Structures are given as C-alpha cells and as structure tokens.
Curated annotation (Swiss-Prot):
Gene coding for it: larMN
Species the sequence originates in: Lactiplantibacillus plantarum (strain ATCC BAA-793 / NCIMB 8826 / WCFS1)
Major site of localization recorded for this protein: membrane
Membrane topology reported for the UniProt record: Multi-pass membrane protein
Official protein name in the record: Probable fused nickel transport protein LarMN
Subcellular location: Cell membrane
Free-text function comment from the UniProt entry: Probably part of the energy-coupling factor (ECF) transporter complex LarMNQO involved in nickel import.
Keyword field contains Cell inner membrane: no
Length: 328
C-alpha cells in the first residue's frame, strides 16, 4: 500500500500533494475545535498514530509471493474521529517515510490520500450507518473492509495510470511499468482476499478491547480517557511486531529498481527498469526497512517500533505543553 518514490511521475506526486494541502488545512482546523471541546483528543492523537504504526508492521504473506498489511484507518476514525484520524495517519506515514524508508517522500501525498483520507472516511461512514441501523459492529467490520479496499483500488489506479501519463517518445513507461489491467487486480486481490479480513480482525479486536477496559476512549464519548490500557496494548504490539518479519517478500508495487528489473525480465516485458525510476529521486532513510545496523533483525524491528511510539508520544507531550502554556 505504501507507494515508493519513482513509481509515480513528479507531476502526479505534485498534483496529489497539492490536492492534500486543503484537506490537511481543514483537518487541522477541525481537530483544533475538537481539542478545545475535548482536551483528551490531544494525547489520543499520539496513541492513535502509534497504534497505526504498529498495526502496519505486521506484514502478511499473499498468494503469488508478495505481502500486505492492515492499516487501522477505520479503527482510528472510530476512536478519535475521522479528521483526527487523518492527521494521526498523516504523521504516521511521514515518520515511516523519513525515518524508515517505508513509502516515498515524493509519493507522500498519494499515500496520505489513500491511507489517511479514503480509508478513515469511508470506514467511518459505514460505521455510522451501522450505528444508525443498530448494527454497530457490523458497520465497523464493513467499514474496515471497504475502507482498506477502496484505498487499495485508488492506489492501483494511481500506479496503473503512469504508463499513460509518463512515457518516452517510443512509448516505454518512465515510472510504474504496469497498466491498469494489472495494477488494479494486483492491489485488490491482495486486499480483498487477505489484508481486508485482517483489517477487520484488528479493528474488531481493538474495538472490543476498548469497549471492555476503557469504554470512554471512543470518539463520541466526551469523558476523561484512561491511557493505561493503551500503553499496555502498544507495548504488547511492539513486542509482537517481529511476527511481521515472517512474511519476508516485498509487497506488490514496492520493489526496488533491481527487484523490478528482475521481475520484468522474468515476465519477458523488459530487460531494464523504467528510466524515470533508475534516474529518479532516491532517499536513504536512517533505519531503512526498520533495521538497525549491528543488531539482529527482530531486535531492530522491536526497537524501531518502540522508537516510533516514543516519538509520537513525545511530540504530543510537547504540543500539549505548548497548548497548556498558551491557555495560561
């Protein structure tokens, strides 16, 4: 689901990040109002971002030799509201790209549109319909499933349009080499068959956990929120995160230029990777692929998870201190 750099043309990336700018602006304004009404929203933003980050570390094997993962977009929308979920997921995606090389820097707008807008808003709309019809959990499950699959569909469209939008004079693709007839089925198959159902399971389990141990931690409950169950949940997920390493293959559409070149050669499509990808923007993250030099992969994975959680919580603590200071 995380589109790397050089799979989308610079024009596509620029268009999508420009389209996201007003969405982020509205989200910030909406969340500021929400925080004024319910101060507990601010610390929950850090918890929500941490939760999404950890959920996305659990990669799953997909038939055909690729992987996929859940995201938690609908879950976050139910916990803190869709606009706050948009911001939490945006910050999560930004940290993943900058620190861990998961998702592109230039493709950040595309990934934010898919996972921080489409997923939480589609999922939350289904959840609210379920509530209206007195089938809360059913609405939540449908929202989680539809949300991630709608995001996958849009990602497939973004990738599949590239051979049409950006190509050489001879018609060779400059960026993603696969057309819509390949990208859409590839993205949807992985999410319809596997990732969508795991998204449902994660969403229902955490929702049930919250309803049981901290029912005030839901968006529509304007009472003081207990953070202790969340800290326990986050620590548990961080410790279990190396399970995501069991699926070692690369997710569809996230290959390096070298991996893509091998695939294209095996499929008798081309003997080289697209030129725009080979000569495009390349960013080396500090802890690329959640690995820390000199440490076992599983240990690096856990430390990456804990580092991300600490960054989110410290960031929110700083914002909370600044908010409290300005109010006094």
């Amino acid at each position: 689901m995380h589109i790397p750099d050089n799979y989308l043309s610079p024009a596509t990336c620029g268009t999508l990040v420009t389209a996201m700018a007003p969405v982020w602006t509205v989200a910030v304004l909406k969340v500021k109002v929400q925080i004024k009404k319910h101060h507990e929203t601010l610390p929950m933003l850090g918890i929500a971002a941490s939760l999404a980050f950890l959920i996305m570390m659990f990669n799953l094997p997909i038939p055909g030799g690729t992987t996929a993962h859940a995201v938690g977009g609908t879950l976050l929308a139910v916990l803190i509201g869709p606009w706050a979920a948009c911001l939490a997921l945006t910050v999560t995606l930004l940290l993943q790209a900058l620190l861990f090389g998961d998702g592109g820097i230039l493709a950040f707008g595309a990934n934010a549109l898919n996972m921080a807008v489409i997923m939480p808003f589609v999922g939350y709309a289904c959840y609210r319909l379920g509530q209206k019809w007195h089938h809360e959990k059913l609405g939540l499950a449908i929202g989680a499933y539809l949300g991630i699959n709608m995001a996958a569909l849009v990602a497939g469209i973004e990738l599949g349009l590239q051979p049409i939008l950006a190509h050489t004079a001879s018609g060779a693709p400059l960026y993603c080499p696969y057309g819509l007839n390949i990208t859409i089925p590839a993205m949807l198959t992985a999410h319809l068959l596997v990732a969508g159902w795991v998204e449902v399971v994660f969403t229902l389990l955490v929702f049930q956990f919250v309803k049981r141990v901290a029912p005030t931690n839901l968006y529509q409950t304007p009472t003081r929120r207990n953070q202790r169950p969340w800290i326990a949940l986050l620590l548990g997920l961080a410790v279990l995160s190396p399970l995501g390493l069991l699926a070692s293959n690369t997710a569809w559409g996230e290959w390096s230029p070298q991996e893509l070149q091998q695939r294209l050669a095996q499929q008798h499509i081309s003997t080289h990777a697209p030129q725009g990808m080979v000569h495009g923007f390349h960013f080396q993250a500090l802890f690329s692929d959640y690995a820390i030099a000199g440490l076992p992969v599983s240990v690096g994975y856990i430390l990456s998870a804990i580092t991300a959680v600490l960054i989110f919580l410290l960031l929110i603590r700083g914002l909370q201190h600044e908010t409290d200071t300005s109010q006094h």
